[in-house]
Amino acid sequence: MTMPPLTLYLAAPRGFCAGVDRAIKIVEMALEKWGAPVYVRHEIVHNKFVVDRLRDMGAVFVEELDEAPTDRPVIFSAHGVPKAIPAEAERRNMVYVDATCPLVSKVHLEAERHHENGLQMIMIGHAGHPETVGTMGQLPEGEVLLVETVEDVAGLEVRDPERLAYITQTTLSIDDTAAIVAALRERFPAIAIPRKEDICYATTNRQGAVKAIAGRIDALLVIGAPNSSNSKRLVEVGRAAGCRVAQLVQRATDIDWEALQGATAVGVAAGASAPEVLVDEVIAAFRARFDTTVEAVETVKERVEFKVPRILREPAETP
C-alpha cells in the first residue's frame, strides 16, 4: 500500500535545557551517592516520562517537605522553592540538595536585591505555578504583586509608584510578556527593569524555533506535559504564528490523527523538559502512517551547561 507523503519539520533547539539536564543529573547522582530512596519535593521537572524513570530508579516524589522522613536526603525541584522550605529542612536537620535552575535563582537574587533597596516587586507570571510560588516566596508576604495579563496592570495597587521593580517567570511567552512590560512601563514610568531578560535562553530559543517553522507547516505538535509552562507557551506561539492545528502531546499515543487529515507538512517541537526519545517516538509514529521526510530546522546552537552542587561532587562520608 502506498503511504501519503508528509514532511516533518523538527524545530531546533528543542527538548532538554541546561537547567532540566542539571536537575535530572542531581537526582541520578543523589541516588548513586546515598542509595534509594531519595525524596524529591514536587516533580523534579514537569515531564511524566522523566519522573516515572526516576521513580523506577528509587526517587520518591512528594508535594510537601513533611512527607519526607528526616533521615533521607531530599531534593528541591528545578522550579525553585520559597525560602521557608530550605529553612524548614535545616530546622529538621535534613540533608537537602537544591536543584533550582540557576537562571531561576538569578531571578530570586534580583528580587532580593531590589527588596534590600526598598523597592516593591511586581512579578509577571502564572498564579500557582511552582516557579512563581518559589520566587514570590523569597520575599515577605505582600512584597511581591503578581500580574498575569495586561488587564491586571490597571488594577495594581502599589505602595509607591516611584519605588517599583519587575521580574518575570522564566518560561513565559516572549510576546505576551513584552505587552505586559509595556503596560507596566506606561503606568509606572519609574519602574526598574531587569539587568538582563528574565525569560531564559531556552524558552526564547524554543519559541523562536517554532516561529521559524510556522510558515511551512499545516499543523504543529509540541511534545510536553500539560503542567509544563514552557510547553504550553510553544502551542500558543504556534497558534499565534498561524498554525491552525497545534497540539500538546505527552507521547505519540496522544496524537489526534483526525485533526491532521490532509496535512502534508507537520512541525514537531519539544518543551524544555521533554527527552529526545519522545521525539523519536513521534517520528516513528508518522513513519508508520506516511512516506515521511524529516527536515531539521535549527535557529541557534545551545552550548549552556550548569554544574551540579558541590555536595554531589564530593565522595559520600563513610560511617
Curated annotation (Swiss-Prot):
Q: Which residues are dimethylallyl diphosphate-binding?
A: H46, H79, H129, S228, S229, N230, S273
Active site: residue positions: E131
- The EC designation for this entry is 1.17.7.4
Q: What catalytic activity is recorded? A: isopentenyl diphosphate + 2 oxidized [2Fe-2S]-[ferredoxin] + H2O = (2E)-4-hydroxy-3-methylbut-2-enyl diphosphate + 2 reduced [2Fe-2S]-[ferredoxin] + 2 H(+); dimethylallyl diphosphate + 2 oxidized [2Fe-2S]-[ferredoxin] + H2O = (2E)-4-hydroxy-3-methylbut-2-enyl diphosphate + 2 reduced [2Fe-2S]-[ferredoxin] + 2 H(+)
Q: Which NCBIfam families match?
A: ispH_lytB (TIGR00216), PRK01045.1-2 (NF002188), PRK01045.1-4 (NF002190)
Say which enzyme class the record assigns: oxidoreductase
InterPro entries linked? LytB/IspH (IPR003451)
**What family is this?**
Belongs to the IspH family.
Question: Could you tell me one molecular function GO term of this UniProt entry?
Answer: 4 iron, 4 sulfur cluster binding
Q: What is this protein called?
A: 4-hydroxy-3-methylbut-2-enyl diphosphate reductase
Which biological pathway? Isoprenoid biosynthesis; dimethylallyl diphosphate biosynthesis; dimethylallyl diphosphate from (2E)-4-hydroxy-3-methylbutenyl diphosphate: step 1/1; Isoprenoid biosynthesis; isopentenyl diphosphate biosynthesis via DXP pathway; isopentenyl diphosphate from 1-deoxy-D-xylulose 5-phosphate: step 6/6
Q: Which Pfam families match?
A: LYTB
Species name: Cereibacter sphaeroides (strain ATCC 17023 / DSM 158 / JCM 6121 / CCUG 31486 / LMG 2827 / NBRC 12203 / NCIMB 8253 / ATH 2.4.1.) (Rhodobacter sphaeroides)
Q: Which Gene3D superfamilies match?
A: 3.40.50.11270, 4-hydroxy-3-methylbut-2-enyl diphosphate reductase, catalytic domain
Residues involved in isopentenyl diphosphate binding? H46, H79, H129, S228, S229, N230, S273
Which UniProt keywords are given for this protein, alphabetically ordered? 4Fe-4S, Iron, Iron-sulfur, Isoprene biosynthesis, Metal-binding, Oxidoreductase
